[in-house]
Amino acid sequence: MSIKNVPEVQEFNNGDKIWDHTFNTFHAKVYIPKSKLPGDIINFGYSAPYFLIFTDFIFTNENALSYAKTSKLSEIASAYDTSIVFINPLNAGGWKSAPEGIFEEIIENSKIHQYHKDGYAILNNRFTHTTEGYAIRGAIFRTFLIGNGDGADYIAKYLLKKITGAGLWGPADIAPTVCLLENLSIKPLKKRRDIPIISVGNSKLINETISEKFDNCIFQESLDIPAAFKFMKQFIRWGWDGELLREIDFNEVNFIEEPCVVELKTSPDNQGDYAGSVTHKTGFISYYNKNVFDKGPVPLVLCFHGGGDSAKHIALVSSWWKVAHDHNFLLVCVEDHLNSTATEMMELLEILKTKYRIDEKRIYASGFSMGGCKTWDLYQEYPDVFAAVAPMDATFDVGCNLYGQPSVGLHGCGKINENILVPVFYTGGEETPLPELPFQAEKCRARMEYVLKVNECTANYNIKFEDQNKWENKIWGINGDSVEKIEDKSRNSVLTINYFNSKDENIYTAFGSISGQGHECRYHTCEQAWFFMSRFQRNKDKIEIHNCQL
């Protein structure tokens, strides 16, 4: 159950903020230090720690401020654009007699969302144009629990195990990512070894038990939050099965993550939050290998996240960053692109050209879900800019933009691209609940027909959606001129790619489906998209083969 009303936020003289809310089983006090990051433009929530402090009594604002400052948690939270949440149970007797289920309710009321402010997520529905409630802003896959005394005992007794609750995409294992346990009076009840433990001020016997029962643990005589966080930040718990993963330290692999904010002119067709404004700010995050520009201009991939997600999300969850790292190109992930148009992306592109040494013949675009729709916008409106595109897992009707409205057309002429060839690598999950592939929706079939026509493919795509029982290919309607199956061993799935020949006997068009995949974006698919796109470069109005033939 989400928070129904906007939290009442109190602001301190130094810019820090705080608010309270009472849920069914617990009280939460959310303290938000003034951020050192441009968090109002770029959503850093995906990579931010979610600090949950299990307190022995309901903190006053002064208690919370004092704890945050003294422990130096406020400095860490400020550096990551996150908050510190103090949790106290509502039952009589505090944590000592608190029932199970409190953590599950905390997670159910915690969200990372496109819209957020002052430590809470604003659950806007862009399709119904309504606000469905509010939630504590926090990444449920980076829950760092801190307990002292009875709070630590509660964690040790109930939370060091598999916990089923509300995950990102439905029921999932939501076990804590890392637990800091200070002044325990009981031995932790081990139900799983993979929960990292920071033991603070505990007895030799308890420390021996922790060392024996848990795979990742460190020990402190007295609380040292900066040292504890250095250990905490290594970990993330991901997926429906709650797998514990170690984060890559970009500094260790000489990789740059560079957030930037720019101001763009608002185009007339903008129907997002900035409609009618003269200008608006847009954020992006660039990812590239250190010294990558030393040898000359490099390829650029413009990347667009899914609806409700963020630039960090598409870079890190899909591992596009790793593709850029492994194959030495510049990745630019655009923040909140649903509130920017294809035309505005052209202005952004010009800004990027002045900031980085970009090979203008090798500019590519890709996106997942609503980001895939943005990529289709670029194909329809600015095809002559891109050497290739890789939209994934979504489409609107041909001729519509990502607002579901008629496109302004080729460079704003009112008519969409009909004859400018752009290499396309499109993929979708075979088990997705959303319409991504031709067998799932007429608009997907029509999109494929449109691309085959624009790219002058020789295949005869004379099929109808209602005649699926007659299709030779149950997913695409027809078979490609050639077919390739590429195994993704990490996910036990297969990417099946149908390639279609164009009139010049080259292959510019690929449609792929992934077995066992729902609505998601995977590293394997992104890397294959790069392999395909990187073959091409654009020389004015002509596509040239840059690499070897398929």
PLM feature spans:
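Short substrate-entry loop that stabilizes the transition state in hydrolases
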Residues: 37-48, 53-95, 292-298, 303-339, ...
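Alpha-helical scaffolding within the catalytic cores
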Residues: 65-74, 184-191, 313-321, 373-376, ...
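Conserved acidic catalytic loop of the alpha/beta-hydrolase fold
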Residues: 102-141, 344-361
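A conserved short beta-strand
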Residues: 165-185, 384-396, 400, 422-423
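Short beta-strand/loop motif that positions the catalytic acidic residue
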Residues: 198-201, 425-428
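Conserved alpha/beta-hydrolase "acid-adjacent" motif
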Residues: 205-207, 433-446, 521-524
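Catalytic histidine-centered segment of alpha/beta-hydrolase-like enzymes
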Residues: 223-225, 518-524
